[in-house]
Curated annotation (Swiss-Prot):
Annotated tissue distribution: Exhibits strong and homogeneous expression in developing oocytes. In embryos, expressed in the animal hemisphere from one-cell to yolk plug stages, and highly expressed in the future brain and dorsal region of the neural tube at the neurula stage and early tail-bud stage. At tadpole stages, expression is restricted at a low level to the head region.
Residue spans of the BIR repeats: 31-101
UniProt-annotated binding residues for Zn(2+): C70, C73, H90, C97
Modified residues (Phosphothreonine): T47
Record-annotated disulphide pairs: none
Molecular function terms, GO-annotated: metal ion binding; nuclear retinoid X receptor binding
Protein location: Cytoplasm; Nucleus; Chromosome, Centromere; Cytoplasm, Cytoskeleton, Spindle
Keyword NADP annotated: no
Post-translational note: Ubiquitination is required for centrosome-targeting.
InterPro entries: Baculoviral_IAP, BIR_rpt
Protein name per UniProt: Baculoviral IAP repeat-containing protein 5.2-B
Amino acid sequence: MLSISPIVSLRRCDNEPSMPDEWRLYNLATRLRTFSNWPFTEDCACTPERMAEAGFVHCPTDNSPDVVKCFFCLKELEGWQPEDDPMDEHKKHSPSCLFIALKKKAEELTLSEFLKLDLEHMKIKMQKQMNLHIERFQAKANEVRGHLEKLDADETQ
């Protein structure tokens, strides 16, 4: 089972090709299955099909039922309106996403093209994780600095 967020997880369907969990979201049908509770389904631009085609997976929360994340660049977007075009919004908020820059479907990529694309995806994931660890470290460092300054102030009194 592949975890997208604390809320959404993906189970493999019988007809889905066997592949590592990391690669399953390249498959349009896998992304589309995450939109089972999507609030916009008819008479709008941001249908589940168009959202999945734009690379998004649906990862709702109690407070934000329309949160989506690009499986590739990891950009999260919410506050969707019925007239919002998923591909246009994706390009506007994450213009450097290589997935939306593809000129063909992921299923049509050569092995070499796919592996190069996936290498970039892994770099993005690692950078995001590294940034998260840096933020946590800086928060702890600031907390410790505050304690040290308090100790110093107590000693000088």
